[in-house]
């Protein structure tokens, strides 16, 4: 049964802190929302606790996404680069929490998959892998989901070029779609304004 009167963010934060204990790296409350960050080694266990603990009961994962912090705060950020953020919902207790975990290795970002905890994580984790290159350990079908299987790189990484590396086009001679190096040339477009005499009835 849905609770009509959810606890306050402060109360929820206290409950989560008590449930997760020393697994909590940080816990913040902003705009009435609770964000808890755990270590990569405790991520899977924390997910199970948040789902099953009496004061939490986050039965649904409603979103999971990757984040690239390499340009955070105009490049002044010096923490770990890749993060996975999950948004959890308790239907029975009418409350939400954001769960974050940072990948411990910037060169080879890996965290545990929570697909076994929430089935909805399946495609979300595939999307984060496709766009950010984050590996989800234990995921049983970690394939690209948005880009082509032959795509080079991960397009949501901050260092990925806006134009990409290759483009696809139909080759009439080969009668098939082919890849070729990007042919877009960057150019600067400066708008030119021509103001006529007595423009708009003004002298």
UniProtKB/Swiss-Prot annotation:
State the top-level EC class. Answer: translocase
Classify the protein's membrane topology as the record does. Peripheral membrane protein
Read off the InterPro entries from this record: NADH_DH_suC, NADH_quin_OxRdtase_su_C/D-like, NADH_UbQ_OxRdtase_30kDa_su, NADH_UbQ_OxRdtase_CS
Q: Which NCBIfam families does the record cross-reference, listed alphabetically?
A: NuoC_fam (TIGR01961), PRK06074.1-1 (NF004730)
What protein family does this chain belong to? Belongs to the complex I 30 kDa subunit family.
Physiological role: NDH-1 shuttles electrons from NADH, via FMN and iron-sulfur (Fe-S) centers, to quinones in the respiratory chain. The immediate electron acceptor for the enzyme in this species is believed to be ubiquinone. Couples the redox reaction to proton translocation (for every two electrons transferred, four hydrogen ions are translocated across the cytoplasmic membrane), and thus conserves the redox energy in a proton gradient.
User: What's the protein called, per UniProt?
Assistant: NADH-quinone oxidoreductase subunit C
Q: What is the lineage of its organism?
A: Bacteria, Pseudomonadati, Pseudomonadota, Betaproteobacteria, Burkholderiales
């Amino acid at each position: 049964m849905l609770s009509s009167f959810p606890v306050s963010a402060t109360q929820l934060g206290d409950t989560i802190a008590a449930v997760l204990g020393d697994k909590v790296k940080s816990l913040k409350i902003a705009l009435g929302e609770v964000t808890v960050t755990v270590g990569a080694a405790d991520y899977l266990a924390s997910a199970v606790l948040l789902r099953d603990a009496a004061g939490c009961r986050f039965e649904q994962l409603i979103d999971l996404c990757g984040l690239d912090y390499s340009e955070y705060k105009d490049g002044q950020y010096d923490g770990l680069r890749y993060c996975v953020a999950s948004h959890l919902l308790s239907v029975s207790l009418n409350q939400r929490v954001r769960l974050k975990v940072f990948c411990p290795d910037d060169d080879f970002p890996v965290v545990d998959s929570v697909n076994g905890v929430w089935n909805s994580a399946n495609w979300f984790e595939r999307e984060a892998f496709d766009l950010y290159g984050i590996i989800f350990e234990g995921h049983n079908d970690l394939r690209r989901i948005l880009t082509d299987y032959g795509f080079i790189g991960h397009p949501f990484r901050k260092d990925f070029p806006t134009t990409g590396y290759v483009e696809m086009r139909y080759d009439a001679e080969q009668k098939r779609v082919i890849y070729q190096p990007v042919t877009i040339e960057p150019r600067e477009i400066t708008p030119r304004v021509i103001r006529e005499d007595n423009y708009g009835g003004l002298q």
